[in-house]
Structure formats: structure tokens, C-alpha cells
């Protein structure tokens, strides 16, 4: 028997957690936090609990490190999960950073406890390259291999191809994770899978038409110039991994294009100060230099990271 069960992101778009059942075994695709209205009254036990059987779960596959896809991993470990955490190589680097911040904000400030949890997570991480099959289990009556393909959503994001066999039944199941748009400034756009017998696909923005990235860039320029003309400051709530890097890149491209022009009175673009108040962001941004093979050429401009000043207050 090959089956799919959903333990999150069913009636909403957060808390992503899907189970692929292959005979008497299974894997999870993501294990994320419920957020916003879907979290009800917040981080309650009912929202964080792993309320499904995991005794047969052989591995967790992470599509990317946004908290609505990975935030319940500590609770999965506490529930007794002892299998590997399979993810892309960039995600393996970023996941402990992301979960450390999440643990400090929503779980505990106990440094020793946080380090124990992060140490356990690091010991379970199995980074795998894109475009290569990885065997999860291979038994007499059931087997499963997974392959990660670039999803273009954030650094390290992947969609997951699963090649499953159970009692002579074969099936290719694909889980999309979150997919990026075309013409992203930093990441190559995702390529479709070669085939799928079943496809589980996200639909967060399925009913929306977005403006072009070029229009968005010049609208950002107009906003900055309007605010700075009056001596103001622009505040942008862009906490999440991915959007912040995109925003820094877009601002850097404007600085490069309009360097000596004034963005405000006696303020040339090249002297524009950028302050990032988000502890996980700059370690991820500056760490991308070691992961340049996963980025679209030209690679991430390190200037966009070094120009930014971190206000790391937490």
C-alpha cells in the first residue's frame, strides 16, 4: 500500500506536515508550526503536539527552513522520532540557526537546553545534493528513495520526488514544498519534474496575479525617495529568510544603478544606510558565499550583506 496523509497545511497554508506511507513504513515531508489565525491562541500544546503515530516513520525530509515547515521538529524529536532529517546541503547549514531563534522566542531562554536540542538536530541531519537519488529504506517488500530538486523559493529550498515500492506496486509521488516565482534575482527558477503519479502541490498564491519584478523594484525606489525627501525612515517588516535577502539585493541593485544620484537631500544612493533587525538573517546572508553553487549567476553580492548593519538585540 502506498498512501498519503496530511498532518498540517490542510485547511490553511501553515503547519506543513505530510506523510507518505509505504507498506508498513513511512516518511514525513516537513514538520512546521501553525502560524497566524491557524495557530488559534498561540503556541498551545494542542498546536505543537505530534498527535499522530510516528513509530513507523523512518525519516523526515525538509523542503526548506521557513518556520511553518520546520518549527515542530523539536516536538517531533521529543515525541520519540529517532530517524534522519534529510534536506539539501544549504538547508542543513541554516536549519540550526533558524530553530535556535525559534526556540529562544517561543520555547525557552535556557541556553543549555537550547544547545542540547540543537546538538540532537545537528546529529540527525543528512544533507544530500540536488538531482541525486537517496535511498531511505530498501526492504524485501517495500522501498523508498527520494530526490531533491531546486524549488526556487529560498536558498536551499527543494521539491521532493519519491520513488516508492510496496508489495510490487510502484509509484512516483512528488511533494512541491513552496515554489518560487520565475525571474527571481538570486535563485534559478524551478524546473518541472519529469513525471509524477501523484502530486501534492502548494497553492498559497494560486489565485493572485503579482506585478512584475521590474515594476516592484522601481516602486521600492519611489517609496524610498518619497520618505527620505522629508528626512524620514522606511521600515520594512521582512523578517523571513528569503524575502530579506531579496530586498537587500533589490536595494543594492538600486544603489549600483543610481549611486551618485540623490535618494534624499544631500544623500546619494551610495551612502544609504540599511539596518537589519533580525538575528538569523545576516548569518544566513553572509554564509551564502560558501553556497554560491546554489545561486543564480551573478552570485549574491557580498556588498549587500556587508553594507547592512545588524541590530542584533535578541
Predicted regions, residues:
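Hard-cation-handling environments
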Residues: 221-314
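Catalytic core of the metallo-beta-lactamase
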Residues: 3, 7, 22, 133-194
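Structured alpha-helical segments in the cores of large, soluble enzyme domains
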Residues: 185-196, 212-227
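Pre-active-site segment of Zn-dependent metallo-hydrolases
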Residues: 10-15, 22-83, 87-125, 179-188, ...
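Gly/Ser/Thr-rich loops at beta-strand to alpha-helix junctions
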Residues: 11, 66-68, 154-155, 239-246, ...
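Gly-rich Lys/Arg/Thr-decorated short loops/hinges at beta-loop-alpha junctions or inter-strand turns
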Residues: 162, 196-208
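Active-site metal-binding loops of divalent metal-dependent hydrolases
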Residues: 9-10, 31-34, 90, 154, ...
